[in-house]
Amino acid sequence: MSDIEIKSSPPESPAEEQEERRLAGRKRARAVDPDEEDDDTQVVNNQDEEKDPKEDDGEEGGNAQAEGADEGEDDEDEDEDDDDDDEDEDDEDDDGERRAKRRRKQKKFRFLDVEAEVDDEDEEEDEDNDYGDVAEFIDEAPEDVGARDDHQHRRLNRVFGRNEEEDVHDIVQRLKERHAGAARYNGDSDAVPQRLLMPGVNDPSLWKVVVKSGREHAICASIFRKVFAQQYSANPIDVISVFCRDSIPGMIFIEARQSASVSAAVNGIVGIFMSRGVNLVPIEEMAPLLKMKKKDVNLTPGMWVRMKRGKHAGDLAQVVDVDQITSGVVGIKFIPRIDLTPREKRKERIAIGKPGGVRPPARLFAYDDVRKIYGRQSVRQGAQGSYLFDNDEYVDGFCIKDVKIPAVATEDVNPTLEEISRFTGDDDSTAKFDLSAIADANKNLSTSLLFPGDKIEVYEGEQTGLYGIVEAVSPDVIAIKAEGGEVHGQTVEVPARSVRKRFDVGEHVKVLGGKHTDASGMVVEVKGDIVTLMSDLGEQEIKVFSKDLRKAADTTNLTVTKGLYDVHDMVMLDSTTAGVVTKVEGGLLRILDQNGAAKSVSPEQVSIRRDNKRFAVATDSQGNDMKVGDNMKETDGEMRQGEVFNIFRSIFVFLYNREYTDNFGVFVARANSLISVTPKSAVNDLTKINPALNQQLPYGGASLMPAPTANLNRNRLINTLVVVTKGTSKGLIGVIKDVQGENARVELKHNNKTLSVNLASLKRKDQKTGATFPLEMAGIASAAGGYGARPNAGQYDINPYGGATAMHPSMGGQTPALMGGRTPAARFGQTPNPYAAGVQNGKTPNPYAAGVGGKTPSAANASGGKTPAWGASGGKTPAYGMASGGKTPAYGMQGGKTPNAYAMAPPGPSGGRTPAYGAYGRPEASGSRPSVMAPPSAPYSAPYSAPTPAGNGAPTPAIPGNPYTAPTPYGAPTPYAAPTPGMPSLSAPTPGPGAGIAPTPFGAPTPYGAQSYGASAQQQRGLPWDWALDFRNVIVEIGPSYRPGSRNPLHFKRGFFDGKRFGYNDIIGENVRAILLDDPSVVEEIPAEYLRPAKADSQGQVVVVIGGGPEQKGQQRTTQYENGGSWMMELEGGDMAPLVVDGADLCRIWKV
């Protein structure tokens, strides 16, 4: 650029020049790239430092001045003016550029001084000027440490000297003045004063609502949930709080501003009495409702308390450990309640739905008993003879346990003397008590037991030893008139808690409380709180608390009353509750009521019950009768046993066993939970004493009146185990307790409730196998037994003679009773008998016999052969239609038929046959002959005989007028001389050709059939078909099958082994591998349905019990004496009485 151009160029304005320099300075102050190391940075810095700041900053101005100097002196003045302006601007730019240079540090060195800067003199001057105003503030002179230390020590010495010179009171006063204004910390200092917390008229009100007592907490919770559920709804409930107080039962308190909100909150909640209204609590009563007075519980070792919760609720306990009382835990000692019910019984009780939470009795811990029930591993032995069981420690029979203090009650404990005596190990009232152990029991004597005139003494406090007569009684203070000492005759007030009653030896007193209530006697000894007196009546010593005594006035009436009662007498506590006297203690009767609760009552509180021990009877769990004097035992629970000494309403049985100490050996049990210790015979047949069933009518002809309904003996069904098959209770198991018409009252097993169920909805339940069978009723074939029928016709059979085994051979063929072979026999089985039933069968004709017509022969109430009778199934000779024809004797269910002219086409099932071609008969070429093995029941009572040609051959001429009255023509009679071949025990000849009664021919008696197996003894006894599978090493007999619904042949190997005896030891499925006793080389695999037990026939035989109750089933005994079909067994160790077993329940042992 030339000088002319420079000169002609106008000078730049200061603002533009400043802006340009500012931009140039910003460019120079750019951030250094991190890749550029210290070398580049150092070079730049050194160059900047070597330059003069003025030259650097005014580089452009300097060049202009140099050029201006060369121009000449004409422009000198103008240049000087410009230089002055430029210098001012340069001075301003110097500071900006200097600051820019200092800010050119890297970001990572913002807080580190990593380079040294060389300041020039101008900067030093500037810094001096910057700190000029504070230059005198810091003393830079070095500090004299020694002088300062000496000064402080002298000051400390002056303080010590001054303290020594000052008086102590001055120091205290000065300290008080110094700290008088300091606020001492107080826990309640931040609390608002109580007067400011009192509610006012602007605060929410408190409303009182009456509720059901005991449900206060539940109702409060319901209100909480209701308010919370509606708080975000369109209509929230404006309730602020709700609470209840345990000390105010039956009320809750709700805080709200309006009563409408309270009504909305409680509306619809169960347990609130809205009829009482919603009441406003006054303002002055609101604050006391929220105050809680804390009670300090003072527990000391040896103190008596009572448990509040669990199965031990109400039990007395003693404090033994208070070391952890600060943690809210106290150690106590009490008598445990351990359930000693056998494990199997507990499982059965749970399986049938009975409650398992039965409260066991309180008894001391016995290691052997617990180990027997729960096993050895459940009990561990601890230190010093203690035991650990179920996480609890037991010492000397007592349970030692740590419980929370709220779990025990410390007030109103009032332990009785008998409760405390159990802690001493003796429950006898005459026992020697440890007085120190019961010293606290009588400490707090209630003032309600004190009356003016009582003698008392002070036993603790400053007035210990003072005694006198009570003059006035108040809740906490008692005024007495002192006797003896310095205050004799003066009235002295003493604390009520420090006094006790005082009695003198020889004084006559009466007991007010405890188990000896109303007893009276003379004081013979006084030791502290225990007074010993001699009873007026029992002449025995009684120990009672002094607080329970009072001076007696009159006992004459009591003496007369006590003579009315004796031990084990039954008394009535009220109109529905009975009990027995367990002990007579002076003026008190110890009673055990029907619910098992022991009570102590006075004779005036009970009434004696008429003695009915001779007539009292009940039914046990197996349906057997029990009476006074029988030895019974429980079937569940504690399995106690004892002798029956009284029975109440045939339900509650009172028993006595002197080995039991509780309640002096007396306990009570329900009759249906007992079983006889000694075996008993089957239940008696009450139909034998029913005159309606045994009524006999004189001879007479048949009647066309309708047959009367059978009188079913349904009492046989009582105590039968059944299962409900229909209705809402389907599947439930129970026991029939009563039969009323067509309904039965069934007591369910799982909850002991009684339901009324129709008999058609019940089925019998086998206790052993669990199988179900129809109930056996009168008038049906299953009641009579027979082939294919369930062998349950023993205990519950309506007709005990139906399908019975043939009579003994010595009795001959009998029709139908045990009076020899004659018809009629002493009005038994007479012909005709229109009203006879049961054993009075074999009648010709009989229009009213249990709805099945006259029968010849007949068994039980089945439809035997009938000639003639009423109804479609009656005996008809001949009959029109019905395919039944006249029947003589029975053909299956319809009987054998005398030729019927109107029968079905040949060869029809109703062909006339005389005698019948039985259901199990087979044709024989020789014609009719007696049966070799006659089936036992009516449906199969025909013998094995040759059939008379069936069809229309040899028909008896019929009169078609009235088919039911057409007589058999005289010219074609049923053979007169030939006897009717019938069943072994109940057979009768066919009536002969006469108008009267056909006698039984003496020359041709009713033939005696061989032994029948259809309804054998084990069927009557109720043995199942598979009984043999439960036993081994027994002797059995072979006979026809009696398994219900069996598809096997009737006889095993066509009857080849019938009547043979086998012995077996091996069981294969439902078969046994048996060896023939007559020929041991014969080994057969026989199904169990063909096996009968071999009966005992002489004494000295070893047998096993295969039937009866569970207490005797499976026992192996030796026969000793037989009487009436029952065997008495030889006594064995532990037998209380001889064992008598029915012969049908015995089976001989094979290999002894």
UniProtKB/Swiss-Prot annotation:
List, alphabetically, the SMART domains matched: CTD, KOW
Q: Where is the composition biased (Low complexity)?
A: 939-966
InterPro entries assigned to the protein according to its UniProt record, in alphabetical order: KOW (IPR005824), KOW_Spt5_1 (IPR041973), KOW_Spt5_2 (IPR041975), KOW_Spt5_3 (IPR041976), KOW_Spt5_4 (IPR041977), KOW_Spt5_5 (IPR041978), NGN-domain (IPR005100), NGN_dom_sf (IPR036735)
Keywords from UniProt, A to Z, are:
mRNA processing, Nucleus, Transcription
Keyword Nucleus applies: yes
Task: Report any one BP term from Gene Ontology.
Answer: regulation of transcription by RNA polymerase II
Q: Where in the cell is it found?
A: Nucleus
Q: Which domain of life is it from?
A: Eukaryota
Region spans: Disordered:
1-104, 906-966
Key word Aminoacyl-tRNA synthetase present in the record? no
According to the UniProt entry, which residue ranges have a biased composition of type Acidic residues? 34-60, 68-95
In which broad location class does this protein mainly occur, judging by the first location in its UniProt entry?
nucleus
Provide any one GO MF term from the record: mRNA binding
Gene Ontology cellular component list? DSIF complex
Q: What functional role does this protein have?
A: The SPT4-SPT5 complex mediates both activation and inhibition of transcription elongation, and plays a role in pre-mRNA processing. This complex seems to be important for the stability of the RNA polymerase II elongation machinery on the chromatin template but not for the inherent ability of this machinery to translocate down the gene.
Tell me its family: Belongs to the SPT5 family.
Describe the protein's quaternary organization and the partners it interacts with: Component of the SPT4-SPT5 complex. Interacts with RNA polymerase II.
Q: What is this protein called?
A: Transcription elongation factor SPT5
Which species? Answer: Cryptococcus neoformans var. neoformans serotype D (strain JEC21 / ATCC MYA-565)
